[in-house]
Amino acid sequence: LANGRQIEFSDKNLGSVFNNQGLKIGENKSSTLYCYPIHSSLKEKNTLLVPIAGEYRLVLADGTKIYANSGSKIRYPDVFAENERVVELEGEAYFDVAKNPARPFIVKTTQSEIKVTGTKFNITSYPDDGFEQVTLEEGSVQVKRKGEVFKLTPGRQYFLDKKSEEIVLADVDPILFTSWKDGLFRFQNMDMLNLSKKISRWYDIRFDFKDERSKKLRFSGAFDRKSSLDEFVKIMESTTDVRFKLDGNTVFISQTER
């Protein structure tokens, strides 16, 4: 929290309400945090850290809902400024922004600045990923990077390659990038390297590729995020040319020999 206090949310304090010098933070049984400002002049910033293998929903003082994926960090104020609403994201989050044309909602990442007034969209911006992407489900979004502004309409995606700094705008099916918040992994022609990063954040495991070919193999499919790691491995081995070997918290991956 802004005053240096740390609160660890768990099953032990479900339903608790914490008073943070003018801000009440409550958690319900669906792992949703609610922020209730007591003093409208308080503009300190708090940080929500979502652990690996975890996820949280956050309802801000203005009514905006944020679904934060595992391994993510979100900084947000107790109370927004009068002319804008600014939060900072590192990781992945889905935003359902409360409409307020007079106070645009701005998400800052290490790469870009995403500006909306009221809409639904997903941002993926993990430090260890080689890309950043913004996927719009509803409304409109402006992505600003190094002086350039990119406007998105529903079903469009902004994709930044961090290494080459190439930016691609494309038509996509938003559900492929937002279904995680509803408890479902969806992949469409995704290479094993990027797929392994998503899986490792959820199951808190490490992937070790035995050869470069395995990293480039692609997978399309869906499975429940509540599935065990063993169930995930069975699904992957039955539908791909990949062999998985689990040793402790490390999964060794190699291509099946034909």
Indicate where each model-derived feature is located:
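A residue-level detector for the "anchor" residue at the start of short, highly conserved motifs
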Residues: 1-258
